[in-house]
Regions:
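Aromatic-lined, polymer-binding surfaces characteristic
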Residues: 1-198, 202, 210
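N-terminal leader/propeptide and maturation segments of large enzyme subunits in energy/redox metabolism
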Residues: 206-244
Length: 244
């Protein structure tokens, strides 16, 4: 009942965007904060879905579309509204805004046909993020090398990949029996995470560029891969080290 009350209340707001981003030209309606709100909204909507009347489902779905779905997918994915590309901000902004919007779209697709269409666009575009070849003019390197390593240090790499995989797993769960599109980089991620960790007595350390804490780990990404059926012994070793 509380989740239902919260959802019916928050959809009355004018915007979920941040004041700083809304002041930009052009206006940025969706940032990392709004992407997280989209994710939380999707979880909440799914949790109370069976307890809502048909009119409440529609009302909440339309409100979440206006406040979160349209900004995330409109700014980051869908034409003609899109103002961003794969190399806007850090690369992980794209997966966060696009994929959290995609998860919300999956949650709303029973009520809103346009949400289902939006989720399909995100799903089809997702491999492009992993294949990003870099941008010479903006001095941005290729995201993943041939051996599976990412140019970001562990903290930011894990965040961007985790956002992508949460959407991919949600897509797989809502499309049982449909073979997911192949993303070759996923098979090599565990090797990357193992090679940038620093085994020691006690909590696992990782190597970084001074942009995160040495105790940050990537078990969330590996658990998502494992749930998708992408498994190997390195993953189990790594997750066991983190557990200890």
């Amino acid at each position: 009942d509380k989740l239902k009350e919260i959802l019916l209340d928050v959809i009355k707001e004018d915007t979920w965007g941040s004041e700083e981003m809304l002041a930009r030209i052009p206006v940025w309606r969706a940032d990392l904060g709004l992407a997280h709100k989209a994710y939380l909204s999707a979880i909440a909507y799914d949790a109370v879905y069976n307890d809502l009347s048909s009119s409440e489902r529609k009302e909440i779905a339309e409100g979440l579309k206006r406040l979160a779905l349209d900004p995330c997918l409109g700014d980051w994915v869908l034409e003609p509204a899109r103002i961003h590309s794969l190399n806007s901000m850090g690369h992980n902004w794209w997966t966060s805004c696009a994929c959290m919007g995609g998860i919300l779209a999956l949650s709303l697709q029973n009520e809103l046909p346009e949400a289902k269409q939006g989720a399909e666009v995100v799903y089809e575009a997702l491999p492009q993020w992993f294949d990003f070849a870099g941008d010479v003019l903006q001095q941005k390197p290729k995201s993943f090398d041939a051996d599976g390593g990412m140019y970001e240090s562990l903290n930011y790499a894990n965040f961007g990949i985790q956002e992508a995989l949460q959407f991919r797993l949600a897509w797989m769960n809502t499309h049982p029996g449909q073979k997911p599109v192949q993303i070759p980089q996923l098979d090599k991620l565990s090797d990357f995470f193992v090679h940038v960790c620093y085994p020691r007595t006690g909590i696992l350390y990782n190597m970084n560029f001074g942009d995160s804490h040495k105790n940050v780990t990537a078990e969330s990404t590996l658990m998502l891969l494992y749930a998708m059926g992408i498994r190997n012994d390195n993953m189990l070793w790594y997750m066991n080290q983190v557990e200890q």
